[in-house]
Amino acid sequence: MLPAAMKSLGLALLALLLCPSPAHGLWCQDCTLANSSHCAPKQCQPTDTVCASVRITDPSSSRKDHSVNKMCASSCDFVKRHFFSDYLMGFINSGILKVDVDCCEKDLCNGASVAGRSPWALAGGLLLSLGPALLWAGP
């Protein structure tokens, strides 16, 4: 009966890995940089539901300078309200600045991801390690 117990335990572990877990907080890339892509992962506050990436460019500049802001946020609307404030709108409407806001809801989705954080990668690793034992146990 031990092989059946191992099989049940393996299936239970697999189910835990494949089900979304609200217990951990969202992780986002966090930085404010000019012409760089080096950001650090940051665990967001429980009230933050999105990762945001904001790119501010000067379309008239021949140097193509830009500023990149990556952060945790409570909503994409909040980020847009912040970056499209009355102060910046004058520059945006006159064509001096261009602001692009992108939001997403998965860990580290606003920048380079960290290897091995995907639940599918974890599930695949579990199947590769437990698969032979489950097959050996048989029905």
Curated annotation (Swiss-Prot):
The keyword Glycoprotein applies. Residues 111-139 form a propeptide. A lipid is attached at N110 (GPI-anchor amidated asparagine). CDD domains: TFP_LU_ECD_Ly6H (cd23549). InterPro entries: LY6_UPA_recep-like, LY6H/LY6L_nAChR_modulators, Snake_toxin-like_sf. It is a lipid-anchor; GPI-anchor. Residues 1-25 form the signal peptide. Disulfide bonds join C28-C51, C31-C39, C44-C72, C76-C103, C104-C109. It comes from the Eukaryota. GO terms for molecular function: acetylcholine receptor binding; acetylcholine receptor inhibitor activity. Residues 26-113 form the UPAR/Ly6 domain. Keywords: Cell membrane, Disulfide bond, Glycoprotein, GPI-anchor, Lipoprotein, Membrane, Signal. Believed to act as modulator of nicotinic acetylcholine receptors (nAChRs) activity. In vitro inhibits alpha-3:beta-4-containing nAChRs maximum response. In vitro inhibits alpha-3:beta-4-containing nAChRs maximum response. May play a role in the intracellular trafficking of alpha-7-containing nAChRs and may inhibit their expression at the cell surface. Seems to inhibit alpha-7/CHRNA7 signaling in hippocampal neurons. Interacts with CHRNA4 and CHRNA7. This is Lymphocyte antigen 6H. The lineage of its organism: Eukaryota, Metazoa, Chordata, Craniata, Vertebrata.
